[in-house]
Amino acid sequence: MCLSLKVLDEGIKEMARRVLKSEDGTIMSDHATLIRGRIMNSAKELLAKEGYSKTTIRKIVEHSGVLTGSIYYFFKNKEDIFRAILLELVRDCINKINQNCCDESPLFKYAAVCQVELKVLADYKIVRETYLEGYNSTIIFEGMVAQFVEMARGLFDDTEYECSDEGYYQNTLMVKGAMHACLSEMFFRREVDSAGTRESLLRLALGVFGVKEAEINGIVEKIRSMNDTWERIGKEMVEHPLVK
């Protein structure tokens, strides 16, 4: 049952490898990869402490010890760094869910990824504010949708829930749009039942793929029972380096 997520992880790694290619098509050296990782880890740490608006290229330079020119060699701007961080966070989340839920179904793993992201946003205010910037950016949001399309494809291809390319895209757009709404709700003045909203999101995410209500109920119930696991995974994602 781990195979689908392993295939997915390879797909996301390939996306990362394409990012790491230089203009002549060669793969960057280990040293270049190390420098890029240092930039991303420093940016992630700053984002978690100060939020998106206060994290500047200058602060990333000071925190990472990497020269400004080197940062612009790898990334166009701060938004580009944030987009790369999100790619790594998704891959990290997938790996952790694969380790903790190896014997679970593709549907459960898909729901678990959604659950972990929303749980992190509910538990960490500064991360919540940073993610809202990402969701509000057309470029970054489009990248989020693309990542979730690849995740769904890796999980559901060759199953009864396999979709066409357009089907994967439409379903993912609905799910990520709903996740954006869940995130925005956390900033509303009215008191919010975040756990209830997350469960509604999971039901929608599974429902768009045609999952029957009885199976959805079972998955949601099990997701609810593993709250400690999601808290631990979320804490590791926020506090641990992206690239070791």
Language model region names:
Residues M1-L20, D157-D158, F188-K244:
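C-terminal peripheral helix-coil segments that are non-catalytic and often amphipathic
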Residues A84, N95-V127:
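Hydrophobic alpha-helical connector segments
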Residues I35, I39-S42, N171:
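N-terminal positioning helix adjacent to the helix-turn-helix/winged-helix DNA-binding module
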Residues R38, L46-D80, A84:
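Helix-turn-helix
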Residues I97-C101, R128-Y131, E185-R190:
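Secondary-structure edge/capping motif, primarily at the C-terminal ends of alpha-helices
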Residues T130-S137, K222:
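Short linear capping/connector segments at secondary-structure termini
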Residues L89-K96, V120-Y124, R128, M151, ...:
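A short secondary-structure junction motif
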Residues Y135-S184, G196, R203:
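Amphipathic alpha-helical packing segments from all-alpha helical-bundle domains
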